[in-house]
């Protein structure tokens, strides 16, 4: 029996793709092997977004290629965004690989493997999976890709060049996948795409995310729905209201604004400016909600006063969750040739300062939850402490809830429990089970 191992890099959209890919391979008689040294195939799902991600992908390819020294039957095959973007360069610079696929649907890749065609990409990427077979994730949450591709053309972003235009799956197809996952015990469905506000623009000729959420909310069973990637420029009142009104949809808004200086936003190609963003957050907070944002430091032309404006804004809005990254100069983007590029050391200093400010804000926000009772999804146990997440916490990027006082009970992973918060940290909470 042929055995395969998967290495997932990059964003959660890759997680969704690889669960489909894994399920398809297993349906063809392949066996998943958790130990890469014992595999016949290693598939590396790469990321090509920014320099740091590209470097990680390349280093990972070399790391796994080295395993071939002790396993002559091993084939190492990179796939995904980096390979779509730099297909010919990778072929030339890493001859040790045994195959290379661009951005293709999992179904296409499996067909190529079955036919012995190990090097293939399309000029127009296949960003959506169209298969009902998928593996069940080891965790109690699952990423479901509702669409992919982007037409925003932000000045700093290369993604449209290798992901293409927005494409959406049908509501019926997504509903069927979510029903299947819930029937298998998945307790949190996380909807992902390059920009979820674009969902339905191509196939329904409108923003169809509210219709999708209304449909998914009617699926039987106890589970959460979390919506990621809401571009602020087209985050409409209808979308906000649909998140607020649907009981199973968490009041968690992932809205990456990138910056707040009107000058920098205009240079980035972002349409909503400072005052409009403030109004947007006010609309979201009409109902108790957690807002997560992502900010960029070091964009060309970012003066000290622009950065200070950003810091002051973070202090004013007090985001429940926040991430940041340093501007990366990427080929085939408008920002690649912009003047006034920022020194790398200054970029790092600004990022550190920004995250230090957010750390204190988060600490203060977490303290306010002491005494409150939250619903928590139990996920694991570490050193006699149960670990779970609340509506505040997307997996891997946000915090956790630690449950230390649970009496003599043995709690079940994947269950929802009520937890009274008794303590807090910078990003995490701790509490005890409500009897």
Swiss-Prot record:
Belongs to the methylthiotransferase family. RimO subfamily. Residues 2-118 form the MTTase N-terminal domain. Binds 2 [4Fe-4S] clusters. One cluster is coordinated with 3 cysteines and an exchangeable S-adenosyl-L-methionine. It is found in: Cytoplasm. The lineage of its organism: Bacteria, Thermotogati, Thermotogota, Thermotogae, Petrotogales. GO terms for molecular function: 4 iron, 4 sulfur cluster binding; aspartic acid methylthiotransferase activity; metal ion binding; protein methylthiotransferase activity. One of its GO terms (biological process) is tRNA modification. This is Ribosomal protein uS12 methylthiotransferase RimO. The keyword Transferase applies. NCBIfam families: 30S ribosomal protein S12 methylthiotransferase RimO, MiaB/RimO family radical SAM methylthiotransferase. [4Fe-4S] cluster 1 binds at residues 11, 47, 81. Residues 367-435 form the TRAM domain.
């Amino acid at each position: 029996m042929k055995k395969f191992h998967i290495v997932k890099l990059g964003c959660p959209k890759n997680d969704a793709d690889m669960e489909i890919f894994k399920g398809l391979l297993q349906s063809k008689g392949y066996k998943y092997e958790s130990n890469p040294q014992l595999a016949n195939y290693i598939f590396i799902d790469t990321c090509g977004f920014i320099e740091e991600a590209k470097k990680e992908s390349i280093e990972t390819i070399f790391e796994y290629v080295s395993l071939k020294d002790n396993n002559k039957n091993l084939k190492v095959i990179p796939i995904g965004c980096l390979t779509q973007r730099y297909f010919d360069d990778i072929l030339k610079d890493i001859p040790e690989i045994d195959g290379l696929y661009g951005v293709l649907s999992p179904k296409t890749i499996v067909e190529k493997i079955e036919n012995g065609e190990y090097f293939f990409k399309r000029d127009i990427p296949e960003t959506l999976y169209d298969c009902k077979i998928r593996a069940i994730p080891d965790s109690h949450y699952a990423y479901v890709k509702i669409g992919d591709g982007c037409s925003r053309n932000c000045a700093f972003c290369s993604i449209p060049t290798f992901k293409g235009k927005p494409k959406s799956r049908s509501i019926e197809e997504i509903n069927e996948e979510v029903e299947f996952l819930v029937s298998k015990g998945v307790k949190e469905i996380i909807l992902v795409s390059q920009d979820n506000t674009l969902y339905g623009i191509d196939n329904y000729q409108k923003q169809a995310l509210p219709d999708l959420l209304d449909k998914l909310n009617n699926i039987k069973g106890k589970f959460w729905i979390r919506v990621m990637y809401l571009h602020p420029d087209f985050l409409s009142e209808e979308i906000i209201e649909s998140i607020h009104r649907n009981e199973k949809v968490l009041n968690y808004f992932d809205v990456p604004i990138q910056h707040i200086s009107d000058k920098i936003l205009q240079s980035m190609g972002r349409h909503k400016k400072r005052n409009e963003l403030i109004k947007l957050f006010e609309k979201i907070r009409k109902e108790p909600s957690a807002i997560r944002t992502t900010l960029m430091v070091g964009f060309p032309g970012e003066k000290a006063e622009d950065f200070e404006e950003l810091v002051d804004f973070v202090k004013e809005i007090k985001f429940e969750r926040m991430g940041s990254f340093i501007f990366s100069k990427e080929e085939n983007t408008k920002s690649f040739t912009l003047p006034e590029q920022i020194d790398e050391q200054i970029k790092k200093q600004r990022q550190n300062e920004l995250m230090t400010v957010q750390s204190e804000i988060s600490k203060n926000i977490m303290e306010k939850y002491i005494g409150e009772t939250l619903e928590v999804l139990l996920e694991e146990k570490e050193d006699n402490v149960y670990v779970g997440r609340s509506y505040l916490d997307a997996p891997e990027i946000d915090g956790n809830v630690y449950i230390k006082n649970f009496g003599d009970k043995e709690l079940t992973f994947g269950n929802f429990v009520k937890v009274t918060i008794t303590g807090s940290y910078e990003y995490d909470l701790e509490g005890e089970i409500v009897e």
